Every structure is written in C-alpha cells, then in structure tokens.
Amino acid sequence: MDQFQHISVVDAQEKLKQQDLNAVLVDIRDPQSFIRGHVENAFHLTNDTIVELMNEVDFEQPVLVMCYHGHSSQGAAQYLVNQGYEEVYSVDGGFEGWHKAGLPVEK
C-alpha cells in the first residue's frame, strides 16, 4: 500500500478488538492531552518514541494513527507508510470523535 486509509472511530475500535490482527493504535497528541485520557493500550508516538515503535511493531501489523480531530494524523499515517508499514489508517474524528462516540478511554 502506497497510501494510508481512513477509518471511522467505530471501525477503529472493532479492528483493535480483533486480537488476531494485532493492530496498534498510536496517539500523536501532546503529552498533557495523552495523560488526561487516551484509548486503552495506545502507544504515545512522538519524535522521541518513533524508534521504539519501529522496533516493537512489525511492518505487517495494522497501525491506526489518532490525533485530536483526524487532521494531523493523516501526515503521520503517510509518514509510517513511507517507512514501510503496510496497513496504516488515519482515525477520522480523532480522539474527539472517539470520546464523543462514547468509546472507552483510560487515564
């Protein structure tokens, strides 16, 4: 895949639930926002943690990228595609959409 795909918050949650997929959600919001609340088991992706992500997550694993509203995540998703990740999604609506949909959040 040369491009990332878009995914709704509900479909993102379903993909994360499918354990056989071993999908990973990365949250690119600022540290304070991440601490206040994030999707369960989300990986906080920053310039300082990108190497850790690439060491821990196989290129074949689905990666879902979340930001605040679903805009910044698109650039990050394309970056991950360019690094070799084969199945990358930008979560439409971002964390705000996830929260408004009443989906689970942890602190």
UniProtKB/Swiss-Prot annotation:
Disulfide bonds: none annotated. Keywords: Cytoplasm, Transferase. Its EC number is 2.8.1.1. One of its GO terms (biological process) is glycerol metabolic process. Transferase that catalyzes the transfer of sulfur from thiosulfate to thiophilic acceptors such as cyanide or dithiols. May function in a CysM-independent thiosulfate assimilation pathway by catalyzing the conversion of thiosulfate to sulfite, which can then be used for L-cysteine biosynthesis. It is an enzyme of class 2 (transferase). GO terms for molecular function: thiosulfate-cyanide sulfurtransferase activity. Its main location: cytoplasm. This is Thiosulfate sulfurtransferase GlpE. It is found in: Cytoplasm. Residues 19-107 form the Rhodanese domain. One of its GO terms (cellular component) is cytoplasm. It catalyses: thiosulfate + hydrogen cyanide = thiocyanate + sulfite + 2 H(+); thiosulfate + [thioredoxin]-dithiol = [thioredoxin]-disulfide + hydrogen sulfide + sulfite + 2 H(+). SMART domains: RHOD. The active site is at C67 (cysteine persulfide intermediate). Belongs to the GlpE family.
